């Protein structure tokens, strides 16, 4: 939703779809021009005034991948389903704070959330709606501390594990899904890609979490 609003307001396209000061100022400016209450927030009235659709208002920013397993699915079935769902996003644009459908835009934690949803795992309080709110852009940090996943050693990593990366200060900055053979699938600035588990962009691995024990 934020990306669509920014485009309608004529703002430059970046990889961040976040309501920051610049976006808020633009919204207030538009609301003033339309005789609307200048809140800086896009409610339904402002959304319609921008010429955006009802369908997008009700559906964008709340997409959850449908569950693709059954009660008879094995652990391996679940791992492969989760990875297959992540592959559906290959080439999808990287947008900070996004967790949309394939082709709409995701960031690293948005991609992982959709993969988890496909196997019936809801990582609350982490959610697609919260993820789009200011202050929750980097949900990888909250997934890292979640009690829903088992901590395993880097040496014990297996296909389907979640790989977390940190900056030089130890702050979690990124998450990817391990594919095996030292490859991961991840959303990285640009688009969703398959890359080596370590490369020049991010090589500080903070930890590994197992989704299926």
Where are these regions (language model features)?
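Non-catalytic cell-wall polysaccharide-engagement segments
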Residues: 200-203, 207-213
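Sec-exported extracytoplasmic/periplasmic mature domains
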Residues: 7-14, 28-36, 51-55, 87-95, ...
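Short acidic, glycine/serine/threonine-rich helix-capping segments at coil-helix boundaries
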Residues: 1-52, 125-129, 178
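Terminal recognition/anchoring or ligand-binding modules at protein termini
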Residues: 41, 54-59, 190
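Soluble non-cytosolic domains of exported or imported proteins
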Residues: 3, 17-22, 41-44, 73-80, ...
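...with weaker cross-activation on analogous glycine-rich loops/strands in unrelated enzymes
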Residues: 80-83, 121-194, 212
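Secreted/periplasmic proteins that engage bacterial cell-wall peptidoglycan
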Residues: 21-28, 81-143
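Acidic, Ser/Thr/Pro/Gly-enriched interdomain connector segments
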Residues: 1-17, 57, 61-77
């Amino acid at each position: 939703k934020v990306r669509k609003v920014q485009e309608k307001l004529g703002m430059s396209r970046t990889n961040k779809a976040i309501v920051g000061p610049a976006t808020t100022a633009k919204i207030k400016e538009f609301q003033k021009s339309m005789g609307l209450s200048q809140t800086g927030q896009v409610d339904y009235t402002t959304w319609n005034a921008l010429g955006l659709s009802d369908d997008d208002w009700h559906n964008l920013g709340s997409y959850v991948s449908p569950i693709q397993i059954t009660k008879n699915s094995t652990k391996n079935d679940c791992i492969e389903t989760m990875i297959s769902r992540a592959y559906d996003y290959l080439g999808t644009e990287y947008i900070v704070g996004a967790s949309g459908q394939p082709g709409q835009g995701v960031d690293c934690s948005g991609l992982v959330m959709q993969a988890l949803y496909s196997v019936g795992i809801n990582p609350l309080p982490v959610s697609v709606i919260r993820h789009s709110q200011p202050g929750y852009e980097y949900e990888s940090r909250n997934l890292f501390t979640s009690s829903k996943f088992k901590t395993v050693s880097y040496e014990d990593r297996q296909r389907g594990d979640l790989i977390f990366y940190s900056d030089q200060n130890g702050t979690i900055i990124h998450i990817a899904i391990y594919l095996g053979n030292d490859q991961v699938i991840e959303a990285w600035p640009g688009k969703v890609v398959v890359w080596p588990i370590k490369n020049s962009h991010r090589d500080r691995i903070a930890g590994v979490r197992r989704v299926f024990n």
